[in-house]
Amino acid sequence: MLAEALPWLQHFRDKIVVVKYGGNAMVDDSLKAAFAADMVFLRTVGAKPVVVHGGGPQISDMLRRVGLEGEFKGGFRVTTPEVMEIVRMVLFGQVGRDLVGLINSHGPYAVGTSGEDAGLFTAEKRLVDIDGTPTDIGLVGNIVNVDATSLMDLIDAGRIPVVSTIAPGADGQVYNINADTAAGALASAIGAERLLVLTNVEGLYTDWPNKSSLVSKIVASELDAILPGLDAGMIPKMESCLNAVRGGVNAAHVIDGRIAHSVLLELLTMGGIGTMVLPDNYAREDYPEGTVFRKNYQDGHA
């Protein structure tokens, strides 16, 4: 098995891989441990992993505990100043710290950071489309600038950054940022080789829940064309992948985080396990020889 992975191990040496950590992988203890081990494995073989995480389930749980209403509109959490206090506390103080601890059980690799630290992210308020109307749902933001100087110092020192997606605005407010969006923006800004997004499904279904509509490879223009019709929960994930490959990332992957070691299975095996999004002008020689695409988008859409 390891000998078969050699072309991929060589390919990812000294390359940055941004992983958006979410879904079941961040609530199941055995999956959390497997994910942490995957990050250490990548670092040990010479890749440069960077983790970006959300914390939806943990935030909802804490809001319930303190008696606050957790409300979503247009797929985004309504973020009042009171909710923002909880978001900030849970993301950086709980979810991020837990993952840093799991990774560091293997050695002193991980460092927790956030979009607020050393100006990593700058945000502005995001209006959310609800039935065609741009709507203010509180302290929800879009990233308008990435300054990765301090993050690159961590990466170059051999650390694994674990990034919480909260960010200051020029207006002095702190904003809650969708973690899928943040991961894509960061991957482009730091010249990542790959972006991986963990989900609770096998990959991209073009006609959810029709199992035969799962695709292994899709190029940016094909994804752009079908994006508005995708399942609502999948749109921010696929939009992040699309923006990443259009921003210079060689490929973006949506993978099933319910499978232990899904990151390694996707990156270091011939066919991978999820969906790979490629730039329109991708060159076959930029990807390890032996890479197999199980089902192209065109296969079902001649």
Curated annotation (Swiss-Prot):
Entries under Pfam families matching the protein: AA_kinase (PF00696)
Lineage: superkingdom: Bacteria
Signal peptide annotation: none
Residues that bind substrate: 55-56, 77, 176
GO cellular component: cytoplasm
Site (Transition state stabilizer): 20, 237
Main location group: cytoplasm
InterPro entries, per the entry: AceGlu_kinase-like_sf, AcgluKinase_fam, ArgB, Asp/Glu/Uridylate_kinase, Glu/AcGlu_kinase, NAGK-C
Catalytic activity, EC: 2.7.2.8
Membrane-traversing stretches: none
Single biological process term from Gene Ontology: L-arginine biosynthetic process
Single GO term (MF): ATP binding
Known pathway: Amino-acid biosynthesis; L-arginine biosynthesis; N(2)-acetyl-L-ornithine from L-glutamate: step 2/4
Compartments where found: Cytoplasm
UniProt keyword Aminoacyl-tRNA synthetase, yes or no: no
Family: Belongs to the acetylglutamate kinase family. ArgB subfamily.
Name of the protein in its database record: Acetylglutamate kinase
Organism: Corynebacterium efficiens (strain DSM 44549 / YS-314 / AJ 12310 / JCM 11189 / NBRC 100395)
Biological classification of the source: Bacteria, Bacillati, Actinomycetota, Actinomycetes, Mycobacteriales
Name of the gene this protein is made from: argB
